[in-house]
Amino acid sequence: MQYQTESWGSYKMSSLGFGGLGMVADTGLLRIESLASESAVVIFSVSTCCMCHAVKGLFRGMGVSPAVHELDLHPYGGDIQRALIRLLGCSGSSSPGSLPVVFIGGKLVGAMDRVMASHINGSLVPLLKDAGALWL
């Protein structure tokens, strides 16, 4: 079995070029951009989601203190979740793979599958080091 050695879909929110690509900047995307840049590691989560709990545990177990935004408790959680689903390219608002969503160094890493694949293939630690979230 082979794993991809580079992070998938990593890009800065500002590189989306809201105006340049003909995309209309909506409030959800602007909130994501702002929140994703507040800390080296940012996790958008739901407080009752077991996959979200696992990702938070992974980072905390590595000695990383992520900023966690529980969307079910956030006043704009619904807008943010819909915008995250669009960013990930998920088909529906109840898409099972949509949360958690992780940003490292302001760049979108992705949902649980991409975070775990990056961890398994060894590319997660360098991302964390580059973002200043991990000192090894």
UniProtKB/Swiss-Prot annotation:
Motif Responsive for interaction with TGA factors per UniProt: ranges: 133-136
Sorted UniProt keywords: Cytoplasm, Disulfide bond, Electron transport, Nucleus, Redox-active center, Transport
Gene Ontology cellular component terms for the protein in this record: cytoplasm; nucleus
SUPFAM superfamilies to which the protein is assigned, alphabetical: Thioredoxin-like (SSF52833)
Disulfide bridge positions per record: C49-C52
Consequence of changing C52S: No effect on the function during petal development
Localization per record: Cytoplasm; Nucleus
Limits of the Glutaredoxin domain: 29-135
Similarity-based family: Belongs to the glutaredoxin family. CC-type subfamily.
Function according to Swiss-Prot or TrEMBL: Has a glutathione-disulfide oxidoreductase activity in the presence of NADPH and glutathione reductase. Reduces low molecular weight disulfides and proteins. Involved in flower development as a regulator of petal primorida initiation and further petal morphogenesis. May mediate post-translational modifications of target proteins required for normal petal organ initiation and morphogenesis. ROXY1/TGA protein interactions can occur in vivo and support their biological relevance in petal development. May be involved in the regulation of the floral regulator class C gene AG (AGAMOUS).
Family matches, as NCBIfam families: GlrX-like_plant
Protein name: Glutaredoxin-C7
Organism this protein belongs to: Arabidopsis thaliana (Mouse-ear cress)
